[in-house]
């Protein structure tokens, strides 16, 4: 459906990818690897705190060093590349990020300490991106790989969730 809509109305990218979900390895459109992240999801109530959750009902506290890599499988033309990558996180003590796009030279970004949601945006045509992150107390949510125009479809993996728990996401998180 995404490919057909993007072919007709424009747009690129696979949309939302959870930062550290093991199920992402089964996606037909993206190769995803990560390290240094611990998954908390609404279906595992013993370790999930609603105050920390995001719209996809998952969050990933990171170790002092973590990484996330995303690479298109190029199976479908409109998901083989994207021109905006947005990493969503909370970094109450700040966060240092080294990024590499399409295997090129690394660039460095630093996020200052903030209590709310922060977004690291990279704009250029790409088919892979690698993040190396360091900082204490940071939580990752996911990465949106998309275009600035056309059709963008985000699929949140809600397996097992009826959706009623979405009402427990703090309003401040939704506003961020």
Where are these regions (language model features)?
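Conserved SGNH/GDSL esterase-like catalytic core that processes O-acyl groups on lipids
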Residues: 1-101, 105-176
């Amino acid at each position: 459906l995404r490919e057909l809509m993007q072919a007709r109305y424009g747009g690129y990218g696979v949309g939302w990818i959870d930062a550290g979900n093991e199920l992402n390895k089964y996606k037909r459109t993206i190769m995803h690897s990560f390290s240094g992240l611990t998954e908390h999801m609404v279906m595992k109530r013993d370790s999930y705190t609603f105050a920390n959750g995001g719209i996809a009902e998952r969050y990933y506290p990171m170790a002092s060093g973590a990484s996330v890599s995303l690479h298109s499988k190029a199976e479908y033309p409109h998901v083989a590349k994207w021109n905006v990558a947005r990493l969503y996180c909370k970094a109450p003590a700040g966060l240092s990020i080294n990024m590499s796009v399409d295997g090129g030279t690394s660039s460095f970004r630093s996020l200052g300490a903030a209590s709310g949601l922060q977004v690291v945006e990279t704009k250029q045509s790409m088919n892979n991106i690698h993040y190396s992150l360091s900082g204490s107390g940071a939580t990752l949510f996911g990465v949106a790989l998309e275009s600035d125009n056309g059709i963008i479809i985000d699929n949140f993996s809600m397996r097992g969730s009826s959706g009623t728990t979405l009402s427990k996401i703090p309003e401040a998180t939704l506003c961020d």
